Amino acid sequence: MELKKFIRDIPDFPKKGIIFKDITPLLKDKEAFNLAIEKMKDYYKDFDIDYIVGIEARGFIIGTPLALALNKGFIPIRKPGKLPAERISTSYELEYGTNEIEIHRDAIQPGDKILLVDDLLATGGTVKAAIELINKLQGEIVSLGFLIELVDLKGREKLEGYDVFTLLQE
């Protein structure tokens, strides 16, 4: 099954000049969605991982079933004001503006082995901010996993020194 055919391009969303990679057709198709998670599980099955950390919102969609498939817990990184307990935050730039993300201060203990996942690797700004949060909590990032990588935006270059897995490259 060719998973790329389940990714649809939406021009000028969320802003003019941006081509949004819509994963909802992949999510809707149970066989394609299951295959995507299984392929990621196969890559990570022998890694020493304590937790899957997913970045809001589509990182939750990939991270939660992957955590279940690997029999690991899931930790969310969220947009501001969405987490109820004490939290830490950081700001970052993305290809169409700026944003902020947060994590519970007690979510990760020093030395916890983390697989950080998101749906898309573009410029690397969001994942670098998430890495900063995990590092502040002294978690050990084992790998970075993405459903899609936009190769032309060179986000991988910002992630030197990390194991990076992408299921699809565009």
UniProtKB/Swiss-Prot annotation:
EC assignment: 2.4.2.7
Reactions listed under catalytic activity: AMP + diphosphate = 5-phospho-alpha-D-ribose 1-diphosphate + adenine
Record's GO cellular component terms: cytoplasm
Recorded metabolic or biological pathway in which this protein acts: Purine metabolism; AMP biosynthesis via salvage pathway; AMP from adenine: step 1/1
Annotated Gene3D superfamilies: 3.40.50.2020
Entries under HAMAP family matching the protein: Aden_phosphoribosyltr
Recorded family membership: Belongs to the purine/pyrimidine phosphoribosyltransferase family.
Role, per record: Catalyzes a salvage reaction resulting in the formation of AMP, that is energically less costly than de novo synthesis.
Alphabetical list of PANTHER family matching this protein: ADENINE PHOSPHORIBOSYLTRANSFERASE
Subunit structure: Homodimer.
Protein known as: Adenine phosphoribosyltransferase
Source taxonomy: Bacteria, Bacillati, Bacillota, Clostridia, Halanaerobiales
Protein's gene: apt
